[in-house]
Amino acid sequence: MSDKLTILRDLKSYLQSNYSNSVKDIILFGSQAHGNSNENSDYDVLIVLKNDYTARDENQIYDLCYDMNLKYSIIIDAHLISEKELTTIKGRQPIFSKAIKSGIYA
């Protein structure tokens, strides 16, 4: 678990340094968080942003996640949501509500 936390914290720090301080939370969910992953499992990560974001912002964040993929030889499957979206129907989708409820926070 400590390796996963190291990766999560490094990802959060990297995004805050290279994207902006609008990154509120990084949450690991899915098989990596629940202990039923294998060597081919990706890292499902929910990135909660303080502000709204554009497609350009999304692409920038995905590029930064790719840097972390290379650094750790993993695959990050990033999902973005803003704090504002958490209060909408998008935020109530099971993928997001489960991640927030039972995921591992950086």
State what each model feature region is:
Residues 31:
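P-loop (Walker A) phosphate-binding loop of NTP-binding proteins
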Residues 1-25, 34-39, 49-106:
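Catalytic core of pol beta-like nucleotidyltransferases
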